[in-house]
C-alpha cells in the first residue's frame, strides 16, 4: 500500500466485511516482507451477500469479493447495483458473451479476460461516485478543462 493509513483502511474493510457475514475464502491481512520496508497487505478473497461493505465500496487494496448469481441477467443487475463504477473485468472463454456483458456494465472501464490494461490514448475514468469522470489520458481529458460559451451580440 502507499501508506500505513491506506493499509489500515484496507484491513478495516476486511474486518468489517467479516463482521457483516462475508465468508473468508482466502485470508488476507498485513504482511511483512523481510528486508523490504513498506505497507504490505496479503491478497484476500471474501464471498457472500452483496449487502456487505466489502462488496459495496471501493477498497483500493488486494481484496476481491465473490457473490453468486443464477444467470447472466442477474449477474449484470447485481454488478450495476452500486454507487460506484470505476472498472470491472469480465472473464469468459466465450468472447461474444463477455463482450455482451461488458457493454451492459455501468463503469468507466470494462476489460475482457484481463484487468488494468490501458493502451495509450484510451480514455479511462469512473462513473457515479468513482474517480474524476471519464477521459483521462486522452483527448477527452481536455473537455474537463474546457468551458464552451457562445456570445451573440447585434452588429
Could you describe each region identified by the protein language model?
Residues 1-11:
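Short beta-strand to alpha-helix junction loop
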Residues 20-21, 37:
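Generic structural motif recognizing short loop/turn segments at the entrances and edges of beta-strands
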Residues 21-31:
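Short secondary-structure junctions
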Residues 33, 37-155:
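Conserved C-terminal structural/oligomerization subdomain of aldehyde/semialdehyde dehydrogenase
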